[in-house]
């Protein structure tokens, strides 16, 4: 039986979306937390930008849902997010020569990567084809609009892919850059389109504990208060692509009002460790509630980009872990069974919950990239991320540009077309 035969999805009712269930899982582990004191600033940034290597064991099955934008009639059997990678030799739409905005850390060819076969694959959904990204079509849809990516460094990775794709049609103007290069604004004057990166670690307000005058890597998260770094811009946005996960793989304490209601990776008698997925669920729930209760956000479209997995093998980031594969996994190598799918399932459940509570014309949907990216261990920078001060460490969290991450924008355009 093929993977697709195993994964028939029963439909259910969502006002703007389709839902379904799957039973397949991926079984992977993360190591115990490893706190390094006195690292250089660069090493600290790398740790914070990437997935902390923490073990997360799932001891129960999860009723997993797949949420899809409601298709047009002629596409009623098209599941954009369930499929396989198939050979394709058209190559990438852009190169590291034709896109001037690729950051050094994602410019894998410039940093010495020689193999190129990882570019010769395209995502093939069940029962339909996913068109290649069309910058003209995209810019026509978002003409006169503002779109923001809300999230961490993987969200930034996503927006960097989009910038490369759009710049083949129109080169954007840098409109804003903060002192840490986290919050950015680009403007496409011909189409009057504004693109924003709104950085957030946890979606909700978080404060790092200081112990003996030093940063501890332990955070207090306040579920009653969202991160104003993104929330204060909501009223100006037409589209939001929201994501988060990697910052939660560390010791955190969840506060509601004046009470600590739960924690992650703590060992205290009077506090319950509810795990990463629970903490993420509460953060997304708070974020979606903020959007739904925004009185000046009528008509805003919110898309949740699901969890993007890492692919460390033979260790973890700090124990020699690497990601040296040069081609995708096939479906026989994927066993859906661990935390990646618990997180993804939770995210889809929360976006469905938000959609059911949608107010004042607000719309919610999903960019479900998890399945596609679980199959792409070959797409990470690995050793080719260009940091001369961290030789021996590999980036198996972010994605090369160009690379498999570009499919996220193929999917984004397909979803926007269905909404348009």
Curated annotation (Swiss-Prot):
The gene coding this protein: XGOAT4
Main location: Golgi
Name of this chain's protein: Xyloglucan O-acetyltransferase 4
Residue ranges annotated as motif DXXH motif: 395-398
Keyword presence, rRNA-binding: no
Side Lumenal, residues: 52-420
Disulfide bonds: 78-128, 99-164, 108-400, 323-396
Top-level division of the source organism's lineage: Eukaryota
Organismal lineage: Eukaryota, Viridiplantae, Streptophyta, Embryophyta, Tracheophyta
CC per GO annotation: Golgi apparatus; Golgi membrane
